[in-house]
């Protein structure tokens, strides 16, 4: 083992260019990165979370100061969440009758403590953030959580997951966020590979707000969960391009969603969304993890959830392989409202007669 948390932190405190050579480094509390820092890890440098510390590997200073950090780059290395040796605390009353957790913002102290979800990297309140050429290995939940970001770039991300936990997202963007690009996310996740969530829950809503002007280019997986999730519940998600999605998805390639409970004062709006160049299928053969086998088989590849409102959506150049699954390629659920939907050039080899299933209200 090389370095300690203290030694790496002392390098980060100097800001500027910070280089970590090959080796395995055990991290026992969150490393804090500040403005004007370029952290570069060698190809085989491993930052591994220590056993039973139940914390993130890295946070930015702005999470604690509430000030905006600028000009942060994190490049390279293997970020190992060591999930088999971490312990998430259950969210009180989650999933039981009367559960109001999805109607509550997260408590800042609980978010910082990270006890409910053990996020691996957290960047809150940033401008000019770049994360690139990284491998994320076995996080307890989300690999990276970015909230309240302006001008951000996430590129060349490898997900090396054992798929053992729920909520094993890849790149999770929490509103407000604008002017961002996410490209080349490769590997299998056990939740959303990429999520744009204007609003959240007690689990993750450290901030909330509009997400807009985002480009997503490239998701690649052999056993994916949901490729790209768009979520609005009170704030809009708008001006988003999604293209070059390749792979098999247990649930959805792209989903238009919200969180319950629905409230009139939290309208749902997903608008100006352009989706193109998808080469997708449902999984064939045995589905892993096996608990996903039954629900996954019938889930549509492109899905508009009940009670969402969407405007100006285009879907084009979609190829679905002959997967033999009894699941729609595109489905609009009951009570979903779409104003201005363009669908063209869909090649569906599934043979199930469910290329486009409309049970909602679609206005051309």
Model-assigned labels for residue ranges:
Residues 1-364:
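Extracellular/periplasmic carbohydrate-active domains that bind, remodel
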